[in-house]
Amino acid sequence: MRKYETIFVAHPSLDEEAVKALIEKFKGVIENGNGTVDNVDFWGKRKLAYEIAKVNEGYYTLINFTANPELPKELDRVFGITDGIIRHIIVKEEQ
C-alpha cells in the first residue's frame, strides 16, 4: 500500500452541497478499491491562478489516501468522466 494525495477543483457554478456529494463519491471510489481515506480537507471557493474553461474560481478539495498502485488509475478515470470537475491531480507522497 502506498500513500497518495489528490487535489481537485470543482466548477464554481455548483453549490457546496453538490461539491460535498462529489467528495463522498470520490471517497467511495477509494474505499471500494480497498483503499483508506486518511484526510479530507475542503478549502472552499478560491480564485484560480489562471482562467480554466472560462472560469476564474473553483472549489478546492485535498484528499490524502492509502491504496494499492492500481487505484489511482481508476480514480483518475472517475475524475475524467465526472461533470463539474475542472482540474485534478493525483501524486504519490514521498516516504
From Swiss-Prot:
Assigned keywords, A-Z: Ribonucleoprotein, Ribosomal protein, RNA-binding, rRNA-binding
One Gene Ontology cellular component: cytoplasm
InterPro entries: Ribosomal_bS6, Ribosomal_bS6_sf, Ribosomal_S6_plastid/chlpt, Transl_elong_EF1B/ribsomal_bS6
GO BP terms in the entry: translation
Domain of life, per lineage: Bacteria
A GO MF term: structural constituent of ribosome
CDD domains, alphabetized: bS6
Protein family per UniProt: Belongs to the bacterial ribosomal protein bS6 family.
Chain's role: Binds together with bS18 to 16S ribosomal RNA.
Name under which the protein is recorded: Small ribosomal subunit protein bS6
Organism, scientific name: Clostridium perfringens (strain 13 / Type A)
